């Protein structure tokens, strides 16, 4: 559809959420916030949920159903709407078709897909590949950057190859479950043991003695067979949002800081899943209280990191600010969009409110179009 045709009506946006990963519930909560903040005067929004088993369903675009209530996490349930599919055929023009009993009936045609999926089977390049095959414009990073950003090992490798500062780490692939002596000496204690391709701090453990490592690896492997062991970095936890504009230029947001010392009365506390989403225990400072010169250096590093993995659309870049300078922890190509998430909060502090932020992402997607870039 041409830009002139779109000017005559609202842009139809499919917000896709849920999915097969262990971050299903957080994806739902992010989608609820996005549905609440998309400008209905400009966008005709439909909601497509993916169940934990992988079925796609057309659901009511009701953000109130996509919230955490009394610590109960939302979920896309089978039978909650009409099952549908997106044919991998660019000639279909973004058509969503029904599965039996109304086999092949066109339910909706969309201009843009907003894949608000966190974790594997969504944020890792898989749905991006499907959307490329279907010839449908979509918000966010492409296949390569999504896959790299999801994999902590390859994120660090690409950033280091581009001369960007990253922390020390080791990778454990099956059947290996222990570190070599030289790796233990290089990393030191404590270390953080994580699923290599996961987010929301699910499956993450802090290890303060090497005899705790096997249990931490086993815990991480409940979510991913590949495990990354990262040296603990002493420093402030800072974040920066990067946003691509419709003309292709990149902007970096005001910084935010996460402070988790003493959460739930534990000296070894860190920003885990419960702290992030259930306990409301961490303190989030936006804007972060950082020297202007240091803040600008971090913003420039965020833009360099964004470019290093060939990212598009948006990303959140996480840092540790140490006595020796900033260190990049990771890049999140589809950051959280919940009411407490740092990405929209940092942009709000930068003068870009939530509806404008979402509109900019969609405008950038439409300007970019489909195909190789």
From Swiss-Prot:
Instruction: Name all ATP-grasp domain ranges.
Output: 156-363
Q: Which residues bind Mg(2+) 1?
A: 318, 330
One BP term from GO: peptidoglycan biosynthetic process
Would the keyword ATP-binding be found if you checked this record's keyword annotation?
A: yes
Disulfide pairs here are none
- Supply the SUPFAM superfamilies for this chain: Glutathione synthetase ATP-binding domain-like, PreATP-grasp domain
- What does the record's cofactor remark say about binding? Binds 2 magnesium or manganese ions per subunit.
Annotated Mg(2+) 2 binding lies at 330, 332
* InterPro entries found in the cross-reference section: ATP-grasp, ATP_grasp_subdomain_1, D-Ala_lig_Van_CS, D_ala_D_ala, Dala_Dala_lig_C, Dala_Dala_lig_N, PreATP-grasp_dom_sf
* Gene3D superfamilies named among the record's database cross-references: 3.40.50.20, ATP-grasp fold, A domain, ATP-grasp fold, B domain
Q: Which residues are noted in the entry as ATP-binding?
A: 184-239
Q: Where in the cell is it found?
A: Cytoplasm
Which cofactor(s) does the record list? Mg(2+); Mn(2+)
- Identify the keywords attached in UniProt to this record, alphabetized: ATP-binding, Cell shape, Cell wall biogenesis/degradation, Cytoplasm, Ligase, Magnesium, Manganese, Metal-binding, Nucleotide-binding, Peptidoglycan synthesis
**Gene Ontology MF terms in the entry:** ATP binding; D-alanine-D-alanine ligase activity; metal ion binding
Q: What does this protein do?
A: Catalyzes the ATP-driven ligation of two D-alanine molecules to form the D-alanyl-D-alanine dipeptide. This molecule is a key building block in peptidoglycan biosynthesis.
User: Extra notes?
Assistant: Follows an ordered ter-ter mechanism. ATP is the first substrate to bind and is necessary for subsequent binding of D-alanine or DCS. ADP is the final product to dissociate.
**Which HAMAP family does the record match to this protein?**
Dala_Dala_lig
PANTHER family according to UniProt: D-ALANINE--D-ALANINE LIGASE, D-ALANINE--D-ALANINE LIGASE A
Question: What name has this protein been given in UniProt?
Answer: D-alanine--D-alanine ligase
User: What is the scientific name of the source organism?
Assistant: Mycobacterium tuberculosis (strain ATCC 25618 / H37Rv)
The beginning of the lineage is: Bacteria, Bacillati, Actinomycetota, Actinomycetes, Mycobacteriales
Please name the gene that encodes this protein.
ddl
